[in-house]
């Protein structure tokens, strides 16, 4: 399972899978909760559930690296600073450094910013990064162990 209406990452991955596989699922991404077309139709519910499983399989096969940043969430938190600047640094939106592999699913995304940046994010992909954040990232990596 999973819930693409509760995870923007799942939403983007699912939309790219739909585009790649040339599958039509008109209710995908509609609303922040399941619309009546899904709630009232066992067929639509089953179709979304099957696609959620496909998204889970795809995400489950990914290699993920995480860094522990033990502070509270918020726009001025250390984790927000690291996230914002890491996205800006890695994005190919402003100055392509290294493009995503040819097999990267994001090439099929209906979202131009995802295809252009080579990241699953939409926020911060067109910003410049502050190199000072690398010190904070290094500290977080060392603390993560």
Which sequence ranges carry the predicted segments?
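Boundary/linker segments flanking structured domains
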Residues: 1-145
């Amino acid at each position: 399972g999973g819930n693409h209406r509760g995870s923007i990452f799942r939403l983007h991955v699912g939309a790219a899978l739909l585009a790649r596989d040339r599958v039509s699922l008109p209710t995908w991404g509609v609303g922040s909760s399941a619309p009546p077309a899904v709630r009232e139709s066992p067929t639509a519910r089953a179709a979304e559930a099957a696609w959620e499983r496909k998204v889970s399989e795809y995400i489950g096969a990914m290699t993920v690296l995480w860094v522990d940043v033990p502070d509270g969430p918020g726009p001025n938190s250390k984790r927000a600073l690291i996230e914002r600047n890491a996205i800006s640094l890695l994005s190919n939106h402003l100055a392509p450094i290294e493009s995503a592999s040819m097999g990267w699913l994001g090439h099929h995304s209906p979202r131009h910013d995802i295809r252009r940046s080579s990241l699953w994010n939409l926020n911060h992909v067109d910003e410049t990064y502050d190199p000072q954040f690398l010190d904070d990232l290094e500290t977080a990596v060392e603390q993560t162990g």
